């Protein structure tokens, strides 16, 4: 007997009709989006005559002349919020306004947080173990990012690192005070700043310090980090522009032989430090403070990392990331104080009135808001990573009337944004007062949903924003306050204002190099006596640490 098919209820009929209508609307909307994508044009691009290399010769020439940041600033002024350059087979898009950053890096973070393929830096020098170079979709990136936050850079741990920062900067003041020749020679001064930044972070990560300015480990770590960062710059390695070169036999790829040799050397160096820390723990001789590596060792899950050896390698990468940006920021601050002595004098008076005859500490920052303004302006004026570390897109990104295609490389062009006169009037001048009333930390400012209210873009934007902002605030604040309190900052004899930044270019675009004509001199015998007394007391109370060597 045939079964009677039940008729749908009135409610079900209405629901099916609504669902069908929604499907049609979604289909039409998708079709319109596809049509819109097809209609939208790519952003503008500077003209170039070289069909094969594109803009690569122009970019490489600018890099050789230490003017890469200026070239991309010029193009931003000519072509607007977004433009692209063709570097061989690769298109690099530069994001040059705060609103474009908000739309592309923040709101579209799920599609703009991957990294390009860096054959030399990521795959060969780092063997895909460097947090900075990994794509955000990779398991290793997620586990390393989590371990970094919970093991080193969260607010509580940033505060826990203050005793090391205070000791190392105090040692720096004492070293320059006891050896005036160090303060008069830029190379020696650069090394002294490097010592205290590396020692501050190696103490927190490995429980091993860097007691001497001439320690080979300073140059070793700096050179290791520089090799990785330079390999991320547009056009630095031709194999990253023309990937087909990677298919050559090894004997025709000197860059790969050198890169893999570097990784082997660096990984062995990190494993040696791990072995040292483990032996200290086993012998009951480890420093009493909890280090990053010790947290990883004692955590049953190693803070989510794959191995202790990989954790040690991450530790080295964190020293590089924290120390090098801290040193570059301090060096650029000195350039600003030389170039704008009125700002230097005002900042020094503010410090003197707040702390008197004692050495400043981080907690004094809340009492001297002008110093926070100086910090913000320093980072705006000389961003340590001027052109941003490139991201890649995982789908087409629409911004206004432009389409950035899937697979494109995108740069947050901090240098150009920081030089936008509509955002920062008179951008070439160093004017801390432009941040008057802004008492926010770097984290608070970067999290502002109103992008026009953010102080600067030094820490990036979106999902990949630098997790070290709490650490950076403390490191930079203590350095700035103590240098101003302790020293006269003056030009090298024979040097006159205005300074030409192109006469002392640094390794990183837009930042000063070792030829910076700076001299630090202790302000008075009384200041020197205070420094000596406080340093002697700090030495007596400080826990014993073995040196970082290798």
UniProtKB/Swiss-Prot annotation:
Q: Quick check: keyword Transmembrane in the entry?
A: no
Give residues annotated as binding heme.
466
| Disrupted-gene phenotype | Does not alter the amount of produced r-N-DMAT.
Which class of enzymes does this protein belong to?
oxidoreductase
The Basic and acidic residues compositionally biased stretches are: 430-441
Q: Please state, per the UniProt record, what induces or represses the expression of this protein.
A: Expression is negaticely regulated by the global nitrogen regulator areA.
Q: Which UniProt keywords apply?
A: Heme, Iron, Metal-binding, Monooxygenase, Oxidoreductase, Signal
Annotated InterPro entries: Cyt_P450, Cyt_P450_CS, Cyt_P450_E_grp-I, Cyt_P450_sf, Cytochrome_P450_fung
Q: Which GO terms describe its molecular function?
A: heme binding; iron ion binding; monooxygenase activity; oxidoreductase activity, acting on paired donors, with incorporation or reduction of molecular oxygen
Where are the residues of the annotated region Disordered? 430-451
Q: Which residues, if any, are the signal sequence?
A: 1-31
* EC number, UniProt record: 1.-.-.-
Q: Could you name the domain of life of the organism this protein comes from?
A: Eukaryota
For whether the record's keyword set contains Nucleus, the answer is no
Q: What does this protein do?
A: Cytochrome P450 monooxygenase; part of the DMATS1 gene cluster that mediates the biosynthesis of a reversely N-prenylated monomeric L-tryptophan (r-N-DMAT). Seems not to contribute to the final DMATS1 product.
Family affiliation: Belongs to the cytochrome P450 family.
- What name goes with this protein? Cytochrome P450 monooxygenase FFUJ_09176
């Amino acid at each position: 007997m045939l079964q009677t098919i039940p008729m749908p209820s009135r409610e079900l009929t209405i629901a099916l009709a609504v669902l069908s209508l929604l499907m049609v609307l979604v289909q039409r909307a998708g079709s319109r989006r596809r049509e819109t994508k097809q209609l939208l044009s790519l952003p503008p691009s500077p003209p170039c005559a070289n069909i094969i290399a594109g803009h690569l010769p122009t970019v490489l020439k600018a890099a050789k002349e230490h003017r890469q940041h200026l070239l991309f600033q010029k193009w931003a002024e000519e072509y607007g919020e977004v433009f692209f350059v063709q570097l061989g087979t690769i298109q690099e898009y530069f994001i040059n306004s705060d609103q474009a950053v908000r739309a592309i890096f923040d709101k579209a973070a799920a599609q703009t947080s991957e990294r390009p393929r860096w054959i030399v830096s990521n795959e060969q020098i780092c063997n895909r173990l460097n947090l900075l170079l990994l794509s955000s979709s990779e398991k290793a990136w997620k586990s390393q990012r989590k371990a970094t936050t919970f093991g080193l850079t969260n607010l509580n741990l940033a505060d826990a690192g203050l005793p090391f920062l205070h000791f190392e900067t105090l040692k720096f003041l004492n070293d320059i005070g006891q050896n005036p020749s160090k303060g008069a020679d830029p190379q020696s001064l650069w090394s002294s700043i490097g010592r205290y930044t590396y020692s501050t972070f190696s103490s927190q990560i490995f429980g091993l310090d860097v007691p001497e300015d001439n320690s080979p480990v300073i140059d070793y770590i700096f050179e290791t980090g520089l090799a990785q960062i330079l390999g991320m710059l547009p056009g630095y390695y031709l194999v990253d522009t023309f990937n087909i070169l990677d298919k050559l036999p090894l004997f025709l790829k000197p860059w790969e032989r050198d890169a893999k040799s570097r990784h082997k050397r660096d990984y062995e160096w990190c494993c040696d430090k791990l072995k040292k820390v483990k032996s200290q723990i086993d012998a009951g001789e480890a420093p009493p403070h909890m280090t990053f590596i010790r947290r990883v060792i004692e955590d049953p899950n190693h803070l989510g990392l794959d191995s202790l050896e990989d954790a040690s390698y991450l530790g080295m990468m964190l020293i590089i990331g924290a120390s090098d940006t801290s040193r570059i920021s301090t060096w650029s601050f000195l350039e600003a104080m030389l170039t704008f002595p009125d700002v230097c004098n005002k900042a020094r008076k503010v410090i003197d009135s707040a702390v008197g005859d004692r050495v400043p500490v981080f907690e004094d920052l809340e009492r001297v808001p002008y110093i926070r303004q100086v910090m913000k302006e320093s980072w705006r004026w000389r961003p340590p990573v001027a052109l941003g570390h490139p991201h890649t897109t995982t789908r087409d990104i629409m911004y206004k009337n432009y389409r950035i295609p899937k697979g494109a490389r995108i740069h947050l062009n901090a240098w150009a944004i920081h030089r936008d006169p509509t955002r920062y009037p008179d951008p070439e001048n160093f004017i801390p007062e432009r941040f008057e009333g802004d008492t926010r930390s770097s984290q608070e400012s970067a999290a502002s949903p109103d992008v026009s209210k953010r102080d600067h873009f030094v820490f990036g934007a979106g999902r990949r924003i630098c997790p070290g902002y709490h650490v950076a605030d403390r490191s930079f604040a203590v350095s700035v306050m103590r240098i101003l309190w302790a020293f006269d900052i003056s030009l090298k004899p024979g040097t006159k204002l205005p300074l030409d930044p192109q006469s002392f270019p640094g390794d990183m675009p837009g930042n000063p190099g070792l030829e910076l004509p700076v001299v630090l001199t202790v302000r008075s015998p009384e200041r020197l006596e205070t420094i000596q007394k406080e340093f002697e007391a700090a030495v007596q109370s400080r826990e014993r640490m073995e040196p970082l060597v290798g």
